[in-house]
Amino acid sequence: MSLVTLCHLTKVYGIIGDLSTLKCIFSDKKLLIAKNCLLCYSLGMAEYIRARSDEHKEERLSQIKEATAELFASCPYSEITLTTIAEKLGWSRANLYKYVTTKEEIFLEISAEKMAAYYNSLLSAFPDGNNFTPDVITEVWAGIVNANQDYMRYVSYLNPVIETNVTVERLAVFKKKYYDLAYAFRDRLAQMLGTTQDAAYKIQLDVLFYASSNAVCCYKNPLVQEALKQINITPPPMDFYKDMKDFLKMRLAWKL
């Protein structure tokens, strides 16, 4: 009888700690090994039980988000699956399924965190009642967008991909967070520019969509770079910060 079989027996019949009934099968040495195996199993079960607490569940979810974000920093979205995420964590897919059912759920959670960081930076940089000029607004806002390029990559996948494969309950929670933050900045921007709330919201949306498009520009794709090289096409140089400043300057001048 193997140790694996023994562990299976202990799991099925609850033989934990007392192996007297199995002494006829194992030598003293094997019995000691078996006891160690059972100890590891019982400790593992205790760890599994703790993982079901709210605190430990949050810890596991943080590990999942961190692993997924690391993968997305170096891999195309299409190559990231629950399998690759589980492998990154050193988990089985079954363990991962205890916390999430789709990779989009993970990306939605990461997007929510990065979204909060972006809008909170804007609200902090532009305090209520400020008298910043359009030039100052342009420079500061472009700097914040530049510092949040990673979030812009997530934005580019939100509407067409991420939001289409999560539950309506999860999506509602995410949308509530978005509108709370976006409307807070909309109101602040409307005061700063002396324009309507609708116009201010349209401006911040235009900036968000332009930035998200630039953040995933095809020229950054190694495959596209190689294809252009083969046909002797040199793509224009890209400067994300400068491009955002130019766009913001133009967009703020046209406030309608």
What do these predicted regions represent?
Residues N165-L193:
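Amphipathic alpha-helical packing segments from all-alpha helical-bundle domains
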Residues L19, K30-C75, T83-T84, G129:
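Basic, helix-initiating cap at the start of DNA-binding domains
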Residues E109, S124-Y151, I203-V207:
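Hydrophobic alpha-helical connector segments
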Residues A147-E169, P222-E226:
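Amphipathic alpha-helical segments used for helix-helix packing
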Residues Q191-L208:
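All-alpha amphipathic helical-bundle segments outside canonical DNA-binding/catalytic cores
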Residues Q63, L71, S78-E105, E109:
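Helix-turn-helix
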Residues A112-Y119:
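Short, basic, alpha-helical segments at the C-terminal edge of helix-turn-helix-like DNA-binding modules
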Residues T10, I15, K23-M45, Y183-D187, ...:
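C-terminal peripheral helix-coil segments that are non-catalytic and often amphipathic
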